Every structure is written in structure tokens, then in C-alpha cells.
Amino acid sequence: MIFQRTVKEMVKTTGVGLHSGNKVTLSIKPAPVNTGIVLVRTDLEPAVAIPAKADLVRETTMCTALVNDEGVRISTIEHLFAALAGLGIDNAVIEVDAPEIPIMDGSASPWVFLLQSVGIQEQASAKKYLRIKNTVRVEDGDKWAELKPFKGFRVDFAIDFNHPEIARSQQHMVMDFSTSAFVRDISRARTFGFMRDIEYLRANNLALGGSMENAVVLDEYRVLNPDGLRYEDEFVKHKILDAFGDLYVAGYAIVGEFCAFKTGHALNNQLVRALLAQQDAWELVSFEKDEAPVSFSVPTGAAVFT
């Protein structure tokens, strides 16, 4: 049987909020089976818990944000959620003392390192997968995203940016998901932005924590970061990373193929909502280890405790 996973013990880190520019402290704690991922705002009195559910994603401008019915929000969850999804962690309580998750280096890599360093604990209950039975598709102009049946988890993603540096890079990628492939090929891809947009955002008290330490920054012609790119195709890989995080608010690892063209946080969330609403399009399943359609084998050097 493939079992559910949580973190072996609590782990804590600090970073900077992308939009506020303020210091943020975050803790990831073990959680019982079938808890899912729950975020807690510890800076409020009393603390407010917000479960990671698709219908609580109520803000998708420049990031993915969970907002409860009282208006309490936790923003910029997507990179941390990509790491949780990539490592197959089903259950965790995430405590944060601010309205946003720290941006770290703009990728999922610091979260992967943090989670692997503390260890991953298998739990005494079967892991549930969301298997796609029928194709579900959403569109917005020329942008679209769909989930369709597939024996594993495959991503087929294309972007289309009219920028000389991005146009020179590979803007289309197909990958069959495994934890090893995610850690190696996707997790280090950083968010990217354009200098013209950053100047506008800062004038409006946004992206105050953004810098070349946590983003790939481009002017009209080139990448401005002195060290350049981490991958030749870092732009499309970061969009895939975002999608991994956005899809994880479905609550389960997906067995199916995710295909997308020019999609972002808003359309990713629309797809998850459309999928969950169409109950004949999916089913929850569990697997024996030798039947696993998706590999969550953690790379060498990281510990999984049984």
C-alpha cells in the first residue's frame, strides 16, 4: 500500500514577504491522516486556520491567495504548495505570522530543502489519488487548460511571451512527473518579472520585497540578473512549478495529464474548480506500491520514515 505522508517533525524558517517586504516566520508541523494542508495565521488573536481548498482561492492576481469567509487571507502559497505536491506530502499544518508566505528565492527549492532536511513520515493510512476519468477544460480567450485521463501524471505546458530573451528560450515542455524529475528539473525555476511592471507595482506599495535575490528580472531586451538563468528554459519551468502548486488545492495528487497554453493562477484555479464540480470526471483511488502510477520516491540523501 502507498501511504499518506506528513513531515517527521516541526521545521521553522524566516523570509521576506514579496509584497509587504516585511520579515515573515513560517513553521511546518506534522498533521494526522486525512488532515490535508491547513494554513494558520498566528499573528491574529485568536489564530485563524484556513484549509487549502479550491473554493477558498479567492485572489489570483500575481499569486494564489486563500481567503476565508471573514476576509482573512494568506497569499503567495503556490511555491510552497508545489514543494508539498512534489514531495507527496498529504498532511501538514503551516503556521505563518503574516498575510503572505515568504518568497524565499522565488522558486520551490528552499521549501524542498527544508522539507527534506526534516524528513518525511509515512502514516498508517492509504494515500488517495484523484484519477481523471473524463476530460475537463477551461478557456479564457486564447488561454486554456485541461485535465484528461492518463496512466501517470504528465504535464504538457506552453507559454508565449513576446520578449526577445524568453522567445530565445524553449517555451514548451512535456514532462512525466516524478519527485526526482520535479526536484531536478522544476523546483529551482524562479518567478520572473519585467522591470516596467516592478516599477509600477512598487509605486502602488506592491512587490516591496521583490529583488534579483528572489526573481528573474528582465528589461525590454535581456535578463538583468548578474548570474543569469538557472535553466535555459527557466520561464516555462516556473509556470509549470506554479501550476503544480495551484493544482494541489484539489487536495490530492492527480493521476492524469495536465495540458495548458498561457495559463496562470486564475485559470489553474478555474480548472480545479471545474474538475471538482464535475463529479463524474474523477474518482479517488489508492494503490499498492507495485501499482503506483506516480513516483514519489524521494531523491538520495533525503529521509522517508516508515
UniProtKB/Swiss-Prot annotation:
Keyword presence, Metal-binding: yes
Superkingdom, taxonomy of origin: Bacteria
BP GO annotations: lipid A biosynthetic process
Classification of source organism: Bacteria, Pseudomonadati, Pseudomonadota, Gammaproteobacteria, Alteromonadales
Binding positions (Zn(2+)): 79, 238, 242
Pfam families per record: LpxC (PF03331)
Organism: Shewanella sediminis (strain HAW-EB3)
Annotated catalysed reactions: a UDP-3-O-[(3R)-3-hydroxyacyl]-N-acetyl-alpha-D-glucosamine + H2O = a UDP-3-O-[(3R)-3-hydroxyacyl]-alpha-D-glucosamine + acetate
Function, as annotated: Catalyzes the hydrolysis of UDP-3-O-myristoyl-N-acetylglucosamine to form UDP-3-O-myristoylglucosamine and acetate, the committed step in lipid A biosynthesis.
EC numbers: 3.5.1.108
Active site, renumbered: 265
Keywords, alphabetical: Hydrolase, Lipid A biosynthesis, Lipid biosynthesis, Lipid metabolism, Metal-binding, Zinc
A Gene Ontology cellular-component term: membrane
Reported cofactor(s): Zn(2+)
UniProt-listed InterPro entries: Ribosomal_Su5_D2-typ_SF, UDP-acyl_GlcNac_deAcase, UDP-acyl_GlcNac_deAcase_C, UDP-acyl_N-AcGlcN_deAcase_N
NCBIfam families: lpxC
Similarity comment: family membership: Belongs to the LpxC family.
Pathway info: Glycolipid biosynthesis; lipid IV(A) biosynthesis; lipid IV(A) from (3R)-3-hydroxytetradecanoyl-[acyl-carrier-protein] and UDP-N-acetyl-alpha-D-glucosamine: step 2/6
SUPFAM superfamilies: Ribosomal protein S5 domain 2-like (SSF54211)
Molecular function terms, GO-annotated: metal ion binding; UDP-3-O-acyl-N-acetylglucosamine deacetylase activity
Protein name: UDP-3-O-acyl-N-acetylglucosamine deacetylase
